[in-house]
Amino acid sequence: MRGILVALTAALIFCSLTPAQPVLHIQETNRAKNRANRKLVARQPEYKAVETLEKNVNIAIAVGTALVTLVSAGVGGMLLSDHLACKSVAKQEEIMQKSWDSMHPDGFTPAGDQMRPVSFDCSTQERGLKPLQSYTNGAEMY
């Protein structure tokens, strides 16, 4: 994914440096006819983009859109994986609570190091998006 991001950024940078292709279908006779009038008309560049896909603006828009899509997909993936992890922890805690209740139908109150598993609510435990914070210490957030 990092390679794609670097390639798209390089394409965005180089699209402004790449010269357009020359227009080859203009005949020399037309240029000879209009040489006298050329001084009166505003100068036009010698090279023009042949198709819309060759224009630098369109290339920049396409590469920029691809970059935004790539970053959005990455952020969406981070949020989805965090949400699925939270749901998995909540499900595991629910299974542990059911196991505790089935083992202690008499309402046993734990003492010492025995504890009934805690209830886990994703709406209060799930953290928001903090892309600048390291995601390597996720266990400390729960």
From Swiss-Prot:
It is found in: Membrane. Disulfide bonds: none annotated. The gene is VMP1. Keywords: Membrane, Signal, Transmembrane, Transmembrane helix, Virulence. GO terms for cellular component: membrane. One of its GO terms (biological process) is biological process involved in interaction with host. Monomer. Disruption phenotype: Decreases virulence in Zea mays. Residues 1-20 form the signal peptide. It comes from the Eukaryota. The keyword DNA-binding does not apply. The chain crosses the membrane at residues 59-79. The lineage of its organism: Eukaryota, Fungi, Dikarya, Basidiomycota, Ustilaginomycotina. This is Virulence-associated membrane protein 1. It is a single-pass membrane protein. It comes from Mycosarcoma maydis. During infection, may play a role in establishing and maintaining biotrophy; the formation of a tight interaction zone between the host and the pathogen. Its main location: membrane.
